[in-house]
């Protein structure tokens, strides 16, 4: 099994657990904010993915959103249920995501949306696919006022320096904004050409790595600003510079 195939198998294993238990999520608790939650299903789905990875790649490390962690020269990054709040409320817009990193960045990734029966995968230098069909990102619009851009903003992140001002500029400049509740799926949709761009501050590793590789392997750009806060930005080629300039404007 290749790394790309293992990422897909692990993401599908997590998604199956979540799909089977929708409506029976068990205990739910808050993390950073009342609407930033974790359920028993999140943990069960993460276990399903991690157990498969540990069995197939016993020397690799892993990092799961819900606490699973082991060091290794390579690290599997797991978000077994991205979009938990959507999931708990019976909404679409959730997925399972697994990516593999080495010292040079992401090597392979998979994002599984069982509701739409879509599996996005990518490998470094080998392109991105959705259900086996190659993804080739179109150039997209050149200006923000023509663009469909996704974002998300948890309550604690609204307090970060400059964030509110940056969002005011986004509201003023972007043609249409979307907040679906699953950043990973939104990144997959950028890779598929369904969205023109994605921008979010202070993004966790498991919310960024799986989708970012999809975007770059489909022909887009996905980069972190490295500023404070650290904005993550992904977009079609022609839009990237315009979108990435928004957080730093005065």
Regions flagged by a language model, labelled:
Residues 72-129:
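DPxDG-like acidic metal-binding loop motif
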Residues 43, 47, 66, 80-83, ...:
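Generic detector of well-ordered alpha-helical packing
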Residues 7, 11-14, 109, 211, ...:
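Small-residue (primarily alanine) positions within well-ordered alpha-helices
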Residues 130-134:
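A structural micro-motif at secondary-structure boundaries
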Residues 137-250:
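An extended, acidic
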Residues 1-81:
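N-terminal subdomain of lithium-sensitive/metallo-dependent phosphomonoesterases centered on the IMPase/IPPase/PAP
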């Amino acid at each position: 099994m290749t790394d790309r195939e293992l990422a897909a198998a692990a993401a599908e294993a997590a998604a199956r657990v979540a799909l089977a238990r929708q409506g029976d999520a068990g205990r739910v608790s808050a993390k950073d904010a009342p609407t930033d939650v974790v359920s028993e299903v999140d943990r069960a789905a993460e276990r399903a993915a991690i157990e498969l990875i540990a069995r197939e790649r016993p020397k690799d490390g892993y990092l799961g959103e819900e606490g699973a962690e082991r060091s290794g020269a390579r690290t599997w990054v797991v978000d077994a249920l991205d979009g938990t709040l959507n999931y708990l409320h019976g909404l679409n817009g959730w997925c399972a995501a697994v990516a593999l990193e080495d010292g040079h960045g992401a090597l392979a990734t998979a994002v599984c949306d069982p509701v739409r029966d879509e599996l996005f995968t990518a490998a470094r230098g080998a392109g991105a696919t959705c259900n086996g069909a190659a993804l080739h990102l179109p150039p997209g619009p050149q200006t923000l006022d023509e663009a469909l851009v996704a974002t998300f903003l948890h309550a604690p992140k609204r307090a970060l320096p400059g964030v509110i001002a940056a969002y005011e500029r986004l509201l003023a400049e972007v043609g249409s904004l979307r907040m679906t509740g699953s950043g990973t799926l939104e990144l997959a949709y950028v890779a598929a050409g369904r969205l023109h761009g994605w921008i979010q501050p202070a993004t966790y590793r498991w919310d960024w790595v799986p989708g970012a590789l999809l975007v770059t392997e489909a022909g887009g750009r996905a980069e972190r600003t490295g500023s404070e806060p650290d904005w993550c930005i992904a977009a079609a080629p022609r839009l990237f510079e315009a979108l990435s300039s928004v957080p730093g404007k005065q």
